[in-house]
């Protein structure tokens, strides 16, 4: 099981938020995002949908537009670790879409930026530290995503493997 220091270190790397969810649905938040800016708190249907996704998977990476999330099964207890949201492109458009979709009413809503490769590597590390399980990039995408989203994921992956780097505005 991962400790709080490790999780705070992951937050430093991804600039995102981490939530520990126990079997009874209790949520322990680690990070600085306010509840009124957290899609998992403002949209309970979204949280329930995420918790019911692919229950057999030990890790589940999913996205809306260019905003990424991850769900990792907790070892030894029933529950999940949720990470995200982080946006993988520069600009305000993804944040505005997420705010509208998940009923976030903060006037100047912004999402943290994290390069896709960095986010995926951090989630692979989280999975390994929590469960001892190793995965490769191709095992991270979710087959439940629509075909165009899967294609977009693999195009970004190929671009990164060829040495492409996204600009980090922070």
Q: What feature does the model see in each segment?
A:
Residues 1-24, 39-170:
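Hydrophobic, helix-rich cores of sensory/ligand-binding and other regulatory modules
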């Amino acid at each position: 099981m991962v400790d709080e220091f490790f999780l705070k270190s992951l937050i430093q790397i991804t600039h995102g938020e981490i939530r520990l969810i126990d079997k009874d649905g209790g949520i322990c938040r680690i990070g600085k995002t306010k509840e009124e800016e957290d899609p998992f708190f403002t949209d309970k249907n979204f949280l329930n949908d995420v918790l019911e996704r692919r229950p057999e998977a030990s890790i589940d990476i999913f996205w809306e537009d260019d905003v990424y999330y991850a769900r990792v099964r907790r070892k030894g207890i029933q529950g999940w670790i949720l990470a995200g949201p982080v946006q993988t492109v520069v600009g305000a458009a993804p944040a505005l879409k997420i705010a509208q979709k998940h009923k976030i009413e903060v006037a100047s809503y912004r999402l943290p930026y994290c390069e896709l490769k960095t986010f995926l590597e951090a989630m692979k590390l989280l999975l390994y530290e929590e469960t001892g399980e190793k995965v490769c990039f191709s095992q991270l995408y979710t087959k439940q995503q629509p075909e165009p989203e899967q294609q977009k994921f693999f195009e970004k992956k190929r671009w990164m493997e060829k040495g492409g780097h996204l600009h980090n505005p922070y």
